[in-house]
């Protein structure tokens, strides 16, 4: 059986979540940020880290950010997504959805 583990190496910066003046997630600005990071030497990206606004986002916004990062990251770049929530079952569900979205 093949191992499901892989070696993580290099720099994986936390990617900020930009907002519009109206307080909505700015998905277009987020996409542009991912594309700018593609031109750097980073090994990948950490989306929805634990030190930002993640706890205050709607689940669908979180999943859309993951989908955008997955669709626009350069080939070979790793995508990690924060999925920790207040209880275990909710964390498991969000983690499964994040994997389906490309993380």
Locations of the language-model features?
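Active-site beta->alpha loop and helix N-cap motifs at the rims of alpha/beta catalytic domains
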Residues: 2-13, 17-103
């Amino acid at each position: 059986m093949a191992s499901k583990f892989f070696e993580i190496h290099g720099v994986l910066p936390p990617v900020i979540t930009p907002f519009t003046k109206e307080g909505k997630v700015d998905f277009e600005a987020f996409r542009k940020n991912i594309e700018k990071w593609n031109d750097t030497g980073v090994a990948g990206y950490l989306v929805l880290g634990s030190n930002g606004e993640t706890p205050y986002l709607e689940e669908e916004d979180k999943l859309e950010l993951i989908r955008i990062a997955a669709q626009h990251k350069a080939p070979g770049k790793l995508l990690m997504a924060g999925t920790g929530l207040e209880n275990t079952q909710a964390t498991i569900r969000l983690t499964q959805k994040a994997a389906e979205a490309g993380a």
